[in-house]
């Protein structure tokens, strides 16, 4: 799984600036989708071939006893417990503060690898910056400027060396013995553990790896109708006798790790509750990660016709950016609707991994343009020439032509819908990238 880097520090030391610098590559990949809710406290970064998750914990007040500061401190402690590396940020311009000492006292007791980072160090001598902070007892401070990027690359490379050294070896992605990797995600009490037991059943379990610590992942390999699957734990599921129970509190970090590791995500909602911001945040991360998706609306059996209509309208209104995914109305407890749900998992995975030949893509593009031309921007009308596939999981379609920066978001969504219809790309995000050139065939040699 992707390692987790937690950014910790008192307010206004530059955590958000460092977070934005570490995760900027992700922001550029996904266009703003209508209704998409993002939680800016969580993001993904990458150095070379090494991806990682970043958690910005907010201002940390370790001794806060109540109110919003107490809740923020609780969330910070949970993030620290689940992080592979903690980056403790202090302010080099203002020097050591009493609150820094309180945070350092707490962090030393956690047993986590701690990187002490002195921010806002631009234009200052290292010795002058670092001297004050040695007394925190966290080793050599690392001087950076999050705003200008100075020292950030070296720091994150060091942090990733430590983080990846503690990661277990993962199975080969192409290992045929491993099935489709499924993450079942959702807020607490929506029925995740009930769905797990309905899917797996005692006789279908092939292997179960009990984790050594609460930070390790559970992978459950199982078969259903002759097909292999691997379930990734997202909810702190632990085995009790012959069933799994959710015995841990909801963990954002584990949810994000599981989504990143999955081939297909099942977003489980509670039909008897309104869709929350937390549901939308989880859904937004699924889209940003480009994961295939199926929506399960659980506890459907307990609703009358009026309540069902209301639940469907709520789903359409609040999660409209998930219109590429199929929704299934199920009862995990009564095991109804689960067969159709799993067929959609298979379809979503097939769509995410689909191979799209260049001649067929180009033909679909030309037909779409003939049916509806892109609008002019001033005197310029975009010319869309040909298309090829640039990647899978999710599918990336690269369109070549002239003046493509004039293509509107509305027309881009029109093309996406045409490609989805032509190639049956249901259940997966679809990326479209435009590349303009004077001679659209110049790079086809």
UniProtKB/Swiss-Prot annotation:
Keyword GTP-binding included in the entry's annotation: yes
Gene3D superfamilies: 3.30.300.20, P-loop containing nucleotide triphosphate hydrolases (3.40.50.300)
Gene Ontology terms, MF aspect: ATP hydrolysis activity; GTP binding; ribosome binding
Binding site for GTP 2: 186-193, 233-237, 298-301
Residue ranges annotated for the EngA-type G domain, each copy included: 3-167, 180-353
Binding residues for GTP 1: 9-16, 56-60, 119-122
A biological process term (GO) from this entry: ribosome biogenesis
Domain of life: Bacteria
First and last residue of the signal peptide: none
Boundaries of every KH-like domain copy: 354-438
Keywords: GTP-binding, Nucleotide-binding, Repeat, Ribosome biogenesis
Record-linked PROSITE patterns: G_ENGA
Pfam families: KH_dom-like, MMR_HSR1
The keyword Nucleotide-binding belongs to this UniProt entry's keyword annotation: yes
Transmembrane segments: none
Family membership: Belongs to the TRAFAC class TrmE-Era-EngA-EngB-Septin-like GTPase superfamily. EngA (Der) GTPase family.
Oligomeric and partner information: Associates with the 50S ribosomal subunit.
Stated role: GTPase that plays an essential role in the late steps of ribosome biogenesis.
NCBIfam families xrefs: GTPase_EngA, small_GTP
Name of the protein: GTPase Der
Classification of source organism: Bacteria, Pseudomonadati, Pseudomonadota, Betaproteobacteria, Burkholderiales
Designated gene of the protein: der
